[in-house]
Amino acid sequence: MTEEKNEILKEIKRSFRSMMNGVASHSMREKGVEYKINWGVNLVNLRMLASKYDKDFELAIALWKENIRECKILATMLMPADKMDAEIADIWMEQVVSQEMAEMLALNLLQYVDYAPEIAYKWMASDKPLYQLCGFCIIGRLFSNGQEPNERGINEYVD
């Protein structure tokens, strides 16, 4: 990662302190949502922060590597969908530890990738609850955007 990207990452991480919500963070921790750091920043503030930056593959990868809730959510907002290949999607999904993150990954990023229907059906058929949730979120967004499933997709959806 370039020095410039590293500085942007540091700037982003510093900005969380001013937006922190200790009550929300504590509540999430009590409910079992574990991250190295969880500032409890709400999604509105994270969207406003993300709007200050262009989509950026390197920055998104660096953000995702941080075990910080807000960094991971921002990564889903800043990753260009056309650069998010299926292998990275699988790696990120393996690292999802909460319902919130499965939803953020689906709604902010994976619904926009070219292979969205394929991973949605695959994950819906998984025996892992977070994969299922993410798959159903993706397919729900695709349906709400007017996409129609093919015959295989219909069979997967009704099973």
Where in this protein do the model-derived segments appear?
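Alpha-helical scaffold domains
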Residues: 1-159
